[in-house]
């Protein structure tokens, strides 16, 4: 799971201030980090179906947030996906 320090690092990197946990950029970055963690977990635990279901829910949540952010601010969306290393 994501540690407190790692979470705070992501918040300071993507947020507007250190207490900015609700902005779209921070939410997408945190979900992306959790998705990366779960994909590594599922590589070694192939039969963990509940984690796989949770991963699919996170991917759907991130997709909807990305769609919203793309409509809201296209340039910031492009820089965000480049920063996170997402394909598109």
Swiss-Prot record:
One of its GO terms (molecular function) is structural constituent of ribosome. One of its GO terms (cellular component) is cytosolic small ribosomal subunit. GO terms for biological process: translation. It comes from the Bacteria. One of the primary rRNA binding proteins, it binds directly to 16S rRNA where it helps nucleate assembly of the platform of the 30S subunit by binding and bridging several RNA helices of the 16S rRNA. Part of the 30S ribosomal subunit. Forms a bridge to the 50S subunit in the 70S ribosome, contacting the 23S rRNA. This is Small ribosomal subunit protein uS15. It comes from Borrelia hermsii (strain HS1 / DAH). The lineage of its organism: Bacteria, Pseudomonadati, Spirochaetota, Spirochaetia, Spirochaetales.
């Amino acid at each position: 799971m994501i540690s407190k320090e790692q979470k705070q690092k992501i918040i300071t990197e993507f947020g507007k201030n250190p207490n900015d946990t609700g902005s779209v950029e921070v939410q997408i970055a945190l979900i992306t980090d959790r998705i990366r963690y779960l994909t590594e977990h599922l590589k070694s635990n192939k039969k963990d179906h509940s984690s796989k279901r949770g991963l699919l829910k996170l991917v759907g949540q991130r997709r909807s947030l990305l769609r919203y952010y793309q409509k809201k601010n296209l340039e910031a969306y492009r820089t965000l996906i480049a920063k996170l290393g997402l394909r598109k």
